[in-house]
């Protein structure tokens, strides 16, 4: 009998779904990687000032939506590029139904410039619950995934080369003389740095002049008081890096649900904390996210509040 943390009340096997979504994300990633080899910036469209979309975003989304419809035919969609016409309601589905939240290429600007990281992000939600989160980083071939109550993991698939598994450190489970087709990958856990040593990621939104004064105040507040500050250009990957202990904290405002939904679950299942900019635990319908290792969360929130107060003087 399977443990409770692998199922929801309606019988969904979340672990199985997570691994199936990993395969779908990898398939989309392979398409993106292939298209990048012959990509031309002349094929890029502007959605807003400094916010871009390409035929690769749309092609990846179509591939993902088609595969997810086969996996859970009754589920709805929230997609960045809106290719799931007829199902894409642009908001959370009702409390009973499941909804896929898809970013087919998070970090499009990075992709355009051939600058890592960029990723595929897929989440399954129901009401106020994030059930499954999968983020596949294409350049490093890393798949981060989690399911509610089951933990967060990295690379739960064997990597074959010349008929042999590249995972030579004993992590791979063998079955009938070969690699077992699926298994839980490396468990993820957030880091333990305090604010003085923290590696902090502060993303800048593309299209919001209102946020410019805030980010200036934030950098002024934290610069010299944390280990270092970074900007990586992908919300999904910033969240995964927090989950893996590569970053200690990440904050961004004016972003879409598809940007953060999968990564947020991965952080929480890795032992981290996620809120919105107001410190509220229910962040799923908002446009801001703050994710940390937990240790530095209050310090980061104080910095956000200090920045706001400075602008009100």
Residue spans for each PLM region:
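N-terminal subdomain of lithium-sensitive/metallo-dependent phosphomonoesterases centered on the IMPase/IPPase/PAP
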Residues: 1-105, 310-313
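Arg/Gly-rich low-complexity intrinsically disordered repeat tracts
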Residues: 3, 9, 157-178
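Residue-level signal for inorganic ion chemistry
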Residues: 32, 57, 68, 108, ...
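Generic detector of well-ordered alpha-helical packing
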Residues: 58, 62, 81, 104-107, ...
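DPxDG-like acidic metal-binding loop motif
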Residues: 90, 94-153
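Short hydrophobic/aromatic-rich beta-strand segments that constitute the beta-sheet cores
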Residues: 133, 152-155, 183, 202, ...
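Short helix-loop capping/hinge motifs at secondary-structure junctions, enriched
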Residues: 152-154, 181-183, 209, 296-299
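An extended, acidic
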Residues: 188-313
